């Protein structure tokens, strides 16, 4: 085989090489958030009274719904027995037009009737939930078109990912609930800065295992390392995680606190009027009672080019609502106490309503 030496190589050309195409800029690496070394990995205790004793603040998140209401009654009962009711703060994340009318006022009334002196309302700044869907769509569309151009494809033919929240992309919870509530944690931490140590906040959430397979996997007590830092340690407590629907309603009956009328209309849950995780019955109820909001959602479907819920459009939900209106007439609230009676019986429900009339002047 012929060998080559250095002198056999072709002479170097003096012609300038053709310019190379610029490599696409590498995406900026997201900085990994480090958790402060003082934040514990696991809770020190899972015993309810010990959790309350250890906490500097006991923050109860209230949506105004039945699970929040039952949880509030239980937490207040334990805190009062310990002489620590002054630690309890109730917070409501105001969702604007997305939530049922009067929900914030009901959540505050429930807190006041329980004897809680501090009630806080937080709200995400800027656009509301429905407008955030449109903003998100614009960003997703711009990103998809940019990637298509870089790949030499027609940007007009790109498929834009769904902008609506979903069970796998619950950005609505982080944007309009969890994020704003963390701003309250920051304020509460500042109020106890004189302690000279991380402030201990017990965050109470009314999530129950019976609601879904996903919630069944949640721990009753855990450290919220994402919300904790060197100034505050957040322990998440789900006091009613193992409770059944019947136990929730029995607690409400004993508490004598008013509950939201949407349950008498047949709703299983009280979240957004039109929640992407809601069942068909809850969504149709929402469209019948707040038709102008359902119409706004339907218009947004057209704007973002995707159904409100995978396999179920808001247009179809509105159609089902109209069918029921034609069959039953305009929706009217069934007799007060209907929802409770299904779980605890009419006798206990009548007793609950009579107590409300005597104590709070509410109609029996």
Language-model region placement:
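Nucleotide-activated chemistry modules centered on ATP-dependent adenylation/adenylyltransferase
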Residues: 2-364
């Amino acid at each position: 085989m012929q060998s080559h030496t250095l002198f056999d190589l072709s002479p170097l050309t003096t012609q300038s090489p053709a310019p190379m195409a610029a490599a696409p800029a590498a995406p900026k690496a997201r900085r990994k958030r480090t958790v402060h070394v003082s934040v514990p990995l696991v809770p020190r205790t899972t015993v309810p009274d010990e959790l309350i004793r250890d906490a500097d603040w006991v923050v109860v998140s209230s949506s105004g719904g039945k699970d929040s209401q039952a949880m509030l009654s239980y937490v207040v009962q334990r805190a009062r027995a310990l002489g620590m009711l002054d630690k309890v703060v109730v917070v409501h994340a105001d969702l604007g037009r997305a939530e049922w009318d009067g929900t914030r006022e009901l959540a505050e009334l429930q807190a006041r009737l329980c004897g809680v002196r501090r009630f806080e309302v937080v709200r995400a700044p800027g656009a509301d939930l429905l407008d955030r869907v449109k903003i998100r769509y614009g960003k997703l569309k711009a990103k998809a078109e940019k990637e298509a151009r870089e790949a030499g494809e027609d940007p007009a033919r790109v498929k834009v990912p769904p902008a609506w929240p979903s069970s796998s992309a619950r950005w609505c919870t982080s944007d309009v609930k969890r994020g704003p509530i963390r701003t309250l944690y920051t304020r509460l931490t500042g109020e106890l800065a004189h302690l000279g140590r991380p402030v201990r906040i017990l965050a109470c959430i009314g999530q129950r295992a019976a609601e879904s397979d996903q919630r069944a996997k949640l721990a009753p007590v855990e450290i919220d390392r994402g919300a904790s830092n060197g100034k505050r340690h957040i322990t998440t407590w789900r006091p009613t995680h193992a409770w059944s629907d019947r136990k929730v309603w029995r607690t409400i009956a004993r508490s004598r606190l008013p509950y939201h009328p949407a349950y008498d209309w047949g709703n299983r849950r009280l979240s957004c009027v039109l929640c992407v995780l809601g069942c068909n019955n809850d969504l149709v109820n929402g469209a019948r009672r707040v038709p102008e909001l359902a119409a706004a959602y339907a218009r947004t479907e057209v704007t973002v080019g995707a159904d409100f819920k995978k396999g179920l459009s808001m247009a179809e939900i509105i159609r089902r609502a109209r069918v029921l209106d034609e069959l039953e007439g305009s929706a009217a609230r069934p007799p007060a106490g209907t929802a409770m009676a299904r779980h605890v019986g009419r006798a206990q429900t009548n007793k609950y309503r009579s107590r409300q009339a005597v104590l709070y002047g509410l109609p029996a």
